[in-house]
Amino acid sequence: MDRMPPAKRPATPFTPLDFQLVLLRRMADHNPDLVEDARHQLGASIAAMREANRRWQAMLHAPRSRAATSRYRQILGTPESVTPRQIGDLACEALLWPVPLWPDLRFEVLVAPNGIAWNEWLVRAPGTPGPVLETLDDLTPWSCTVDEAARAFAPARPLEGTAPTRWGLAFTAPDKSGVRHDCAAEFTWGLLQRVGVKGRP
């Protein structure tokens, strides 16, 4: 008598914790020590972070992948807020979710009228004071978001990121002595990772 094949075990749900590990996995290239501390704070192993990232990539590239908005709603639940937003000629909605690892931040998805996610990144929570950004010394890893750096050191010029979840900004910023320097800042998921200063190693 032929043996029945073993029943396929249902996949465990992809949780908000898993999503936070995905955010960290992309940041580990630039700031491994910060990521390690955050991972311990979440009570997750390196293996768990890698597995979360593997499952995330599989979801993104699945033949019948969900639309980004549906995917985030399934993983993160109902958005904390949904707000109309006008960016140039583009009318869209901003969906915000809390991120327990960073209580002062929110994960924002900008959705165009056709339902396509136009942008997905971390922003400062509404009503939460942002960092004081005046000199190069203030631009420490994880200290600010893309829009905060762009406002503090305007005019800033967007730079092409090295991956879909990475952004760059070019601007000038003073050092402690007031001498201005040309800078290139790198962000992952909208959060500052490092700043390169022209003429410095």
Stretches with model-predicted labels:
Residues 48-54, 124-134:
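A short, surface-exposed helix-loop junction/capping segment
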Residues 109-128:
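Short, structured interface segments
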Residues 2-114, 145-193, 197-201:
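A cross-family detector of function-defining hotspots
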Residues 132-147:
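Long, low-complexity, intrinsically disordered C-terminal regions of large eukaryotic nuclear proteins involved
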Residues 119-121, 139, 195:
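Generic beta-strand hydrophobic packing signal
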